[in-house]
Amino acid sequence: MSFITLNNFFNTNTFFGLLPEQYAPFDPLIDVLPIIPVLFFLLAFVWQASVKFR
């Protein structure tokens, strides 16, 4: 039940701000930018696995 509520919350535009109209071409880039720190976090595990978690 709470998942449905959270899902509806994240789908509305009240949580995420809208970019001004002149920045509209950058909208797809803005959607991807928050994922970059997660990729660095996963890269740390891949790096440690490659050196056998020394």
Swiss-Prot record:
Keywords: Chloroplast, Membrane, Photosynthesis, Photosystem II, Plastid, Reaction center, Thylakoid, Transmembrane, Transmembrane helix. Pfam families: PsbK. InterPro entries: PSII_PsbK, PSII_PsbK_sf. One of its GO terms (biological process) is photosynthesis. It is a single-pass membrane protein. Belongs to the PsbK family. PSII is composed of 1 copy each of membrane proteins PsbA, PsbB, PsbC, PsbD, PsbE, PsbF, PsbH, PsbI, PsbJ, PsbK, PsbL, PsbM, PsbT, PsbY, PsbZ, Psb30/Ycf12, at least 3 peripheral proteins of the oxygen-evolving complex and a large number of cofactors. It forms dimeric complexes. One of its GO terms (cellular component) is chloroplast thylakoid membrane. The chain crosses the membrane at residues 29-49. It is found in: Plastid, Chloroplast thylakoid membrane. One of the components of the core complex of photosystem II (PSII). PSII is a light-driven water:plastoquinone oxidoreductase that uses light energy to abstract electrons from H(2)O, generating O(2) and a proton gradient subsequently used for ATP formation. It consists of a core antenna complex that captures photons, and an electron transfer chain that converts photonic excitation into a charge separation. Its main location: plastid. The keyword Mitochondrion does not apply. The gene is psbK. SUPFAM superfamilies: Photosystem II reaction center protein K, PsbK. This is Photosystem II reaction center protein K. The keyword Transmembrane helix applies. Residues 1-17 form a propeptide.
